[in-house]
Amino acid sequence: MRYPESLLKLTRALSRLPGIGPKTAQRLALHLAFHKEEAEALAEALEGIKRVRACRECGNLAEGELCPICQDEDRDRSLLAVVESVADLYALERSGEFRGLYHVLGGALNPLEGIGPKELNLEGLFRRLEGVEEVVLATSMTVEGEATALYLAEELKKRGVRVTRPAYGLPVGGSLEYADEVTLGRALEGRRPV
């Protein structure tokens, strides 16, 4: 069957997005073809995303020079969380528990992929340390995330900054029998009195 070229073009564009395969892309394209108001709203949102760029201070997404978090005077500027990505920053923000500032590295150390310290936003991090009392290394619990945290801990301690790592353990609502050994071990190491 021959489809209109504009529908094919939209389907191809949608299928290049992460998590969207060809069938989902086609369903979305067909939906938009029959729901013009939603298509218009999406087009407007896509036009607006062109204004988004990296915050010059932390690497978060911003529509101006600084992101809303860096502009927020109520944030604790003595506390800095280092994350691998903007998605990680958003995950911490959703918790509502962290009131400091962030620094986005733009990845994790991965020598096999050619990602060393020079490929990450480390110089920006080191420039931001004035007035910072504690850096929380909130990198992933992967080999790369752990390597990045160890490297940064060494570098930051040389600069006289207190370095911490989030406690890792069991998820709320999770069953012990399904937890892996490493998670259980970390949960037991980080136990606290009740």
UniProtKB/Swiss-Prot annotation:
InterPro entries found in the cross-reference section: DNA_Rcmb_RecR, Hlx-hairpin-Hlx_DNA-bd_motif, Rcmb_RecR, Rcmb_RecR_Znf, TOPRIM_dom, TOPRIM_RecR
PROSITE patterns referenced in this protein's UniProt entry, alphabetically: RECR (PS01300), TOPRIM (PS50880)
GO biological process, one term: DNA recombination
ZnF C4-type: positions: 55-70
Claim: Hydrolase is one of the keywords in the record: no
Alphabetized SUPFAM superfamilies for the sequence: Recombination protein RecR
UniProt keyword Thylakoid present: no
GO molecular function: DNA binding; zinc ion binding
Residue span, Toprim domain: 78-171
Top-rank taxon, per record: Bacteria
Record keywords: DNA damage, DNA recombination, DNA repair, Metal-binding, Zinc, Zinc-finger
Role, per record: May play a role in DNA repair. It seems to be involved in an RecBC-independent recombinational process of DNA repair. It may act with RecF and RecO.
UniProt record similarity statement: Belongs to the RecR family.
Name used for this protein in its record: Recombination protein RecR
Source organism of the structure: Thermus thermophilus (strain ATCC 27634 / DSM 579 / HB8)
